[in-house]
Amino acid sequence: MSKPIRKAAVPALAAALLTACAGFAVFFVTLPSPEPFRHQNPATTALMDARAAEAKAHHRPVKRNWKWVPLSRISPWLQKAVVNSEDARFFEHDGIDIVETEAAISKAAEHHKLGRGASTISQQLAKNLWLGEERSLSRKVREAALARRLETLGKERILELYLNVAEWGDGIYGAEAASRYWFHKSAASLLPEEAALLTAMLPAPRPRNPKHPNGH
């Protein structure tokens, strides 16, 4: 490349870099802050709103069975089952589990299909709170960035939020509503086997029934 061409390329490259930096800055500045949820509970979530919009679009009644409870009123059996199943390194990572992500990428490359399993509890919470069911690369980037931000709330608060907004059936949200709907008892009273059945619903909460986990 001649000197005049190199000199002409420098301003163009600088402009491109500045544009990219500005784009990233706007991207991160416009991300929602988790700070309001440090001491306050959400009044709704993106997932709940998406489900409501879906119901209205199909002329069905909007269902929202939801009751908030503190983490201390959610069975330790359910807490442990969810962490072990959904995010075994929950208390070790900072929102993104690099080990699981690398394993998921390798598996996807092997089977030519992107599967579930790399999303941490923090990422799933970010998706439920703010992103809904959108599927795109930009959504995954936002999900990861929001998961890192959520980590500032602390692990116990993240787990409390997650267990209170997770979907556990058609219009059923949170551990308390799920426990009362499926087992007619409070979330605090769940037995180990009941906690395991609820945990098994999380990957596909609407089609699965904890009373008939095999579909029979």
What are these regions (language model features)?
Residues 2-216:
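Juxtamembrane regions of bacterial inner-membrane/periplasmic proteins
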